[in-house]
Each structure stands twice: as C-alpha cells, then as structure tokens.
C-alpha cells in the first residue's frame, strides 16, 4: 500500500508535466505483466489516450515512431539487471525521454533512470512476485487515467485493495489441495495447453513460459480464446491436458465459447480443467474492480 503511494506520486508528476503517449516496456515476464495494464488503460481511457506495450528487445532493434521527448515510459525489472531493458533505458535517457522503473534503485537499471524515478518491486521479505508488479503498475497507470478524468473511482480502488495481499494468500491456501492434485496428475505430460483472454492473457503467457517452460522445462502451448478455433482446437486430443483460465471482463464470452466446445466431449480429451476467477472471492472488493 505504501509502495503504491510512491507509484501514484510518480504518476502525478507525469500528469503535471504532461505527456503525449504512454509506453509500457518489458521483456519476458515483465512484458507479460504489463499487458494487463495496457488492457486496463485502453478499457478505461479516453479516445485521445495513446498507450503502447513495447518489447525492450524489439525497441532496441527497431524503435517506435510515436515515441518522442514528450512521451513517458514505464518499465520493470525485479533483478535490476535485465540486459534488454538496461540497453533500452540508456538509449531512451540519451534521447531525453522520461523513464520510470519498478526496480531496485541500486541496480544498473535503477542507476540508469535515477533513484528518484524508481520504486522497488520486491517486498521486504525478499521478493514481490507478480502481484507486486501488477499492483504497482496499476497504481501508476490508473492514476494517470484518474488525472485525465477517466477513472474517478481511483481512491476507492486503492482503499479497497489496501489489504488484498492477505486475501490473495487465503485464496492460495484454499486452492492448494487442487493444485497438488493437478500437479501430480500432469507433471509428466508431454505438453500442456493453456487458454486465456483479456485481462488474463498476459498472465496466461507468463505462467506458461516463465513458470513452466523456464523454471520447470515443461512444454506448453498457450493460445487466446479468440484464436483457439483457428487451428489450435485440432491439437486437443486424448492425453493432452488443457487449462482454460476464465476471466470476468468483456472477453468472458470468448472463454465461454471455448468451455462449451471443450465440455462437449467431441475431442475425446477428458483432461479438461477450468479455472474461473469468478469462483474466488476477495472480501470488500466491489465487482467493478474484480477485472483489475
């Protein structure tokens, strides 16, 4: 909560100075995480707001024509050493572009952007996890929207998420038995398919690529609910574990179409798993904020 206030203050600084476009820059997991904020800023923003999600490695190779000295960049690196991000940040600073980072001030990236433009991503116990990255980015992006008159419920959102960390731990504890069951059942599967959409799509990629592929060397196939019917459905067959992450935003109807197909049984695949965020309550959080 207190760290979030620092991100809010940085957003206020940007709003006071003015900007022509917002760039959210990551690589790997941070790119995946920032996808959620891109979705939210486009969902709640006005038609004149320009928000771009950019990949640091791609920006280093080709730049971006809409980025000017009036633009603002938000990036992240929990380690503070991500090579692609560091290279991009240095180039951006040379061009006079404002860069703010969720990273440790003493790290190379933190030093490049300046300690006053950093907010530490890790918690006091050594790590922040994805939730910290999402929360801090949302504090920054939603505050910018609030200053534009697009998200008047900002203060209410911040107040209602003040103790969200405790509730997230409770959700994990309640899901642990099912998680253990799924892990034992599918640990040795040749590959696993993950499907998601909307606000959950970035997290779907992150879980597949960073948690399973990078950390556990598990083969995965991740696909959006929107694209599932344009090729990937042909790969659903007996013995292939399929996980559908169902969200609560406008794209839920796309998830529901996928669920209906999977549950028809026409593929012969019985390893179908539905994880629906609507089944996990967060006390004190209004329905309008659940998509966030």
Walk through the language-model features, giving the residues of each:
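Active-site phosphate/pyrophosphate-binding segments
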Residues: 1-21, 125-126, 133-136, 142-225, ...
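Glycine-rich phosphate-binding loops that contact phosphosugars or nucleotide phosphates
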Residues: 15-154, 160, 245-273
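Structured C-terminal subdomain patch of bacterial secreted/periplasmic proteins
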Residues: 267, 278-292
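Generic structural signal for helix capping and beta-alpha/helix-loop junctions
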Residues: 61, 109, 229-230, 282
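Internal helical hairpin/lid segments
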Residues: 202-276
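Aromatic-enriched
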Residues: 162, 271-277, 290
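Short, ordered loop/turn segments at secondary-structure junctions
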Residues: 104-106, 225, 277-280
């Amino acid at each position: 909560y207190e760290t979030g206030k620092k991100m809010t203050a940085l957003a206020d600084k940007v709003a006071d100075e003015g900007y022509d476009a917002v760039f959210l820059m990551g690589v790997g997991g941070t790119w995946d995480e920032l996808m959620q904020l891109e979705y939210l800023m486009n969902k709640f923003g006005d038609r004149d707001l320009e928000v771009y999600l950019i990949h640091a490695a791609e920006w280093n190779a080709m730049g971006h024509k809409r980025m000017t000295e009036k633009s603002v960049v938000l990036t992240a690196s929990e380690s503070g050493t991500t090579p692609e991000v560091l290279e991009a940040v240095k180039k951006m600073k040379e061009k006079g572009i404002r860069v703010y980072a969720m990273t440790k001030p003493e790290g190379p990236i933190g030093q490049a952007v300046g300690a006053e433009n950093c907010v530490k991503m890790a918690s006091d116990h050594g790590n922040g996890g994805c939730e910290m990255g999402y929360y801090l980015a949302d504090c920054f992006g939603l505050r910018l929207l609030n200053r534009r008159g697009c998200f008047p419920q900002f203060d209410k959102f911040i107040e209602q998420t003040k103790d969200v960390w405790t509730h997230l731990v409770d959700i994990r504890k309640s899901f642990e038995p099912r998680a253990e069951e799924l892990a034992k059942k599918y640990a040795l599967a040749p590959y696993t398919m993950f499907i998601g959409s909307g606000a959950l799509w970035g997290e779907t990629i992150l879980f597949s690529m960073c948690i399973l592929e990078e950390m556990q060397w598990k083969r995965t196939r991740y696909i959006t609910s929107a694209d599932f019917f344009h090729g990937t459905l042909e790969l659903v067959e007996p013995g292939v574990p399929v996980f559908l992450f169902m969200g609560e935003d406008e794209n839920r109807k796309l998830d529901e179409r996928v669920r209906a197909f999977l549950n028809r049984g026409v593929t012969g695949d019985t390893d179908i798993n539905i994880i629906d965020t609507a089944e996990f309550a967060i006390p004190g959080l209004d329905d309008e904020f659940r998509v966030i």
